[in-house]
């Protein structure tokens, strides 16, 4: 327990002891008065063998004085005999009156030490109960009557993290600046989530931290509150340069973290800024020259400034935060991170926050966490890897009916807030154009959009009460989009961890609720095994196929006649096949098992378009998968209908097409 917490406890105990002394004096006066006027004659004298007068006293003391001695406890308690017998000994005065004798000081001290030791030795489960006992032992040396309840005594820290049982933000009042607490209150937060309550105190003490928690568990506030407190305590000024760096994997997450930081800094005067790819570099340089105390950044742009902006002062850095560490490594920032860590001063506090712990994250922890780090894993003992308020399931759907199922589902839930995940940018682009064309308004976010467009769309969807957002995995990490009702995974994720991040966009916060739907082909059901191993429970959703909109013929006519949709559908189909071919779980998502004509139907094609894919054959030669040039199958002499070889020689290929 820290000194601050001990002082707090001592102060409480001293106040209570003062009150108890006054009460005990009154009790003694009352007992003296009642004992001097016994109801049943004189008080019996002490026996020659040193016998005590307790029994006689018990008969002679009136009811009022008995209640007084019991500390004002209800009559039921007295009748049931639950009041502890006082350890005070009675002696007979010369005039025959009995008076209580207080126990010697040494005995009281022994009891205090003994009970304190018992409280300190207690495990995390029993510590709160033991603490109350120890507090009562300190507070009531003269009157050992048992209390029914004691809510004033603060509970001691639990576990390794030093976090109080009290999870309200108000409990941080002695550790966190009042301006920060005021901002938290204005944001509407009353209680800390588990990751916050386990992380904030050790981070305020300056510990290095490696934290793992489910998506939507409140990791952002868990690191922002301590870093703001660090800057405030050090009285950082713009001329001191940058004191805190917060790294985010995507621009959207960086913007969101910056937004939360902006709200927390409402009542502070320190400078803060956002640095990310896609924004005006010269404006960022000017801000850095003026001095930014807290920077939220994406790794690529940050490294660029560290290497090429001479006036960027980062040598005074006190703290480095890496948010969504596993995602930063996944999207190819490993080298940039290593270079950034080398350039930063070695004496600093480091925090790594992540939703999943991978080997790469452990490697990053080894090179970035200098001091003995504290590991906080709030979900390690949980049976389920996803949040409790999430109802999740899957639907088995053949390839040719995938779009019909999606269209029916979105049409039915158009008044709700829905996110649909695709495997490629081109697939998002095509479905965005198609659905809007057929009067089902949707939004889209993908990596090939310009940053301004991505930002506008992101905030538009965040602020909307209902709507449909089509996206790639760029939106699956860390983004806190409020009140998402459904997560639909139209294309299956690359692995179970990616599934967890995708569904983490819904059912966020303490009492969040949401639904998740995974669409699988019959050949892909083996993926459920991997999800089960990753503690993801899925039930099969019932779907009435008779209610599915049969718009296949209209879709095919539309794609055939509309040139722009036709080109977009071709690119989407090709990117879907290529993404499928690059899947990490090839034993389940095997591109050779795809029925291309059926897959093509879901994109509105009667005949599959040609796709240039290099896949290894049994004889070691390179082969090509896909449909024919333009609309038909491309046929060569040594190929089955479902496969197309890659052209190795420069001989002219057979370009015949099926009529349609």
Curated annotation (Swiss-Prot):
Pfam families listed in its UniProt record: CTE_SPB4 (PF13959), DEAD (PF00270), Helicase_C (PF00271)
Biased composition (Polar residues): 25-40
InterPro entries according to UniProt: DDX18/Has1_DEADc (IPR044773), DEAD/DEAH_box_helicase_dom (IPR011545), Helicase_ATP-bd (IPR014001), Helicase_C-like (IPR001650), P-loop_NTPase (IPR027417), RNA-helicase_DEAD-box_CS (IPR000629), SPB4-like_CTE (IPR025313)
Key word NAD present: no
Helicase C-terminal domain location: 389-559
Sequence ranges of Basic and acidic residues compositional bias: 124-133
Entry EC number(s): 3.6.4.13
Subcellular location as annotated: Nucleus, Nucleolus; Chromosome
GO biological process, any: cellular response to estradiol stimulus
Subunit structure: Interacts with NOL8; the interaction is RNA-dependent. Interacts with PRC2 complex components EZH2, SUZ2 and JARID2; these interactions prevent deposition of the repressive H3K27me3 mark onto rDNA in pluripotent cells.
Name by which UniProt lists this protein: ATP-dependent RNA helicase DDX18
Classification lineage: Eukaryota, Metazoa, Chordata, Craniata, Vertebrata
Gene: Ddx18
């Amino acid at each position: 327990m820290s000194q601050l917490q001990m002082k707090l406890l001592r102060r409480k105990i001293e106040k209570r002891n003062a009150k108890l002394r006054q009460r005990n004096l009154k009790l003694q006066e009352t007992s003296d008065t009642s004992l001097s006027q016994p109801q049943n004659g004189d008080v019996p004298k002490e026996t020659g063998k040193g016998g005590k007068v307790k029994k006689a006293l018990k008969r002679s003391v009136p009811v009022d004085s008995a209640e007084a001695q019991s500390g004002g406890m209800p009559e039921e308690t007295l009748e049931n005999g639950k009041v502890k017998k006082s350890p005070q000994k009675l002696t007979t005065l010369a005039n025959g009156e009995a008076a209580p004798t207080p126990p010697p000081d040494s005995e009281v001290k022994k009891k205090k030490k003994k009970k304190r030791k018992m409280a300190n030795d207690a495990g995390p489960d029993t510590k709160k109960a033991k603490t109350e006992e120890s507090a009562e032992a300190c507070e009531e040396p003269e009157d050992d009557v048992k209390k029914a309840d004691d809510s004033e005594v603060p509970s001691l820290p639990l576990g390794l993290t030093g976090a109080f049982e009290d999870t309200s933000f108000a409990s941080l009042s002695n550790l966190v600046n009042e301006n920060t607490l005021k901002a938290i209150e204005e944001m509407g937060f009353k209680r800390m989530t588990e990751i916050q309550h386990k992380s904030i105190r050790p981070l305020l003490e300056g510990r290095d931290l490696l934290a793992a928690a489910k998506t939507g568990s409140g990791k952002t506030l868990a690191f922002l509150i301590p870093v703001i407190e660090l800057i405030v305590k050090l009285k950082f000024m713009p001329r001191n340069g940058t004191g805190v760096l917060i790294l985010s994997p995507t621009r959207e997450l960086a913007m969101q973290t910056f937004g939360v930081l902006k709200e927390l800094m409402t009542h502070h005067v320190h400078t803060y800024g956002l640095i990310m790819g896609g924004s005006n570099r010269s404006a960022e340089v000017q801000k850095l020259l003026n001095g930014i105390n807290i920077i939220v950044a994406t790794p690529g742009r940050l490294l660029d400034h560290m290497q090429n902006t001479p006036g960027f002062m980062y040598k005074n850095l006190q703290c480095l935060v890496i948010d969504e560490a596993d995602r930063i490594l996944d999207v190819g920032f490993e080298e940039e991170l290593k270079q950034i860590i080398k350039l930063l001063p070695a004496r600093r506090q480091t925090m790594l926050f992540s939703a999943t712990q991978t080997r790469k994250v452990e490697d990053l922890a080894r090179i970035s966490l200098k001091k003995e780090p504290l590991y906080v894993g709030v979900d390690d003992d949980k049976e389920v890897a996803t949040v409790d308020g999430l109802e999740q399931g899957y639907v088995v759907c053949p390839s040719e009916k995938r779009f019909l199922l999606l269209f029916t589902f979105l049409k039915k839930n158009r008044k709700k807030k829905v996110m649909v995940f695709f495997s490629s940018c081109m697939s998002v682009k095509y479905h965005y154009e198609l659905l809007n064309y057929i009067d089902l308004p949707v939004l889209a976010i993908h990596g090939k959009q310009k940053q301004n467009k991505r930002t506008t769309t992101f905030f538009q969807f965040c602020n909307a009460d209902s709507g449909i957002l089509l996206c790639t995995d760029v939106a699956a990490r860390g983004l806190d989009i409020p009140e998402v009702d459904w997560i639909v995974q139209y294309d299956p994720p690359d692995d179970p961890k990616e599934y967890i991040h995708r569904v983490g966009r819904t059912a966020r916060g303490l009492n969040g609720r949401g639904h998740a739907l995974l669409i699988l082909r019959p050949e892909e059901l083996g993926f459920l095994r991997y999800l089960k191993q990753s503690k993801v429970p899925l039930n099969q959703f019932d779907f009435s196929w008779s209610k599915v909109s049969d718009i296949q013929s209209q879709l095919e006519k539309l794609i055939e006649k509309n040139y722009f949709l036709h080109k977009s559908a071709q690119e989407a189909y090709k990117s879907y096949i290529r993404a499928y071919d690059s899947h990490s779980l090839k034993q389940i998502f095997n591109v050779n098992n795809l029925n291309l004509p059926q897959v093509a139907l879901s994109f509105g094609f009667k005949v599959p378009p040609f796709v240039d894919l290099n896949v290894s054959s049994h004889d070691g030669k390179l082969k090509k998968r896909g449909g024919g040039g333009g609309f038909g199958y491309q046929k060569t002499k040594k190929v089955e209908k479902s496969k197309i070889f890659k052209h190795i020689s420069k001989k002219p290929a057979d370009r015949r097409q099926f009529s349609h």
